[in-house]
Amino acid sequence: MDSRKILSKIAYYYIAFTKSTLRVRSIDLVGRFKEQSVYALWHGEQILPLCLNSGRQIVAMCSMSKDGEIQAGVLKDFDFIAVRGSSSKRAERALIETIRYARKGHFVAFTVDGPRGPIHKVKSGLLLVSQKIGIRLIPISAIAKNSLTFKKAWDKFKVPLPFSKTVAVYGNPIVIGKDDNLEEKALTVEKELNKLSEFANKYYWSKDINEYLSHHPKPKIFIKCKNNINACIDKINELKQKYPLSVFTLYISDKENKNISLPQNVSVINKITSKLKEEVFDVCYGTSFIDNIRIKPNFKLTI
């Protein structure tokens, strides 16, 4: 067997084993599989975003180099469709082939700063697929808390270690219109990917709750109202100013709020929501605390 095929198999079995041991928390802002998408990720972080989304016949571009051949073998074993091409070799044909697959309904994944860098600089040409087909682009960052980083590599390539805690963050979709400037859109993608990568690499693991919530792409805050509804509403408005991307759940228990008479109807919900500046939250009401939990919050507060 060719040495590159051997290396490809070794890499596949290592990644497959590691994947089976990871404890993964996904932060998916839009539902990544709800509609066809182009996934954008950094070259140095590619292992986790790709292997966590395997088995879906996603199209991914690999370079024409020896490393690209190894990568293509790994991707095929994970049920990806590997298209060979790079910025210097067979680029146009590879893009045309990728667009052809996209027209058939396949999802697409690009390492948008690959294959040679510079690091974390998006190549605008790769956005053509999203623009030509009219499908959304979703930035992705997935990081294992324990990983091996090749610091001398141009992309600071990361290899996740087995049994690691892992976070996968799927950002808000970016739409690239037919008349949009690709260079400007490349900067937008670059900015969003850097934010997600910074959060996944650093702030997700922070023990400082303010730091965590400030950098979370869409934190979920759960507030349990024990006594004063107006105080809870004021607190939500205060937190909304501090963490503008937050989504809130306000839980009102009729067991603990014996002094509050709240009929279970739409008018009460409307009355509460009208006092809030933003209506991006849930209001839960009832006797069962567990039954009324609709989200897994990042932060809980009792007032």
Q: What residue spans do the PLM features occupy?
A:
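An aromatic- and histidine-rich active-site surface loop
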Residues: 128, 284-296
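Membrane-interfacial amphipathic helices and adjacent loop/beta segments
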Residues: 5-26, 62-100, 258-267
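Active-site proximal beta-strand in glycosyltransferases
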Residues: 296-303
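A short, well-structured juxtamembrane/interface segment
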Residues: 14-36, 43-48
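A short, glycine/small-residue-rich beta-strand->loop->alpha-helix junction that serves as a flexible
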Residues: 223-234
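Catalytic core of membrane glycerolipid acyltransferases/transacylases, capturing the structured
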Residues: 36-89, 133, 148-149
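Short internal beta-strands
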Residues: 59-64, 248-254
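Non-catalytic C-terminal accessory region of glycerolipid acyltransferases
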Residues: 1-13, 17, 54, 96-217
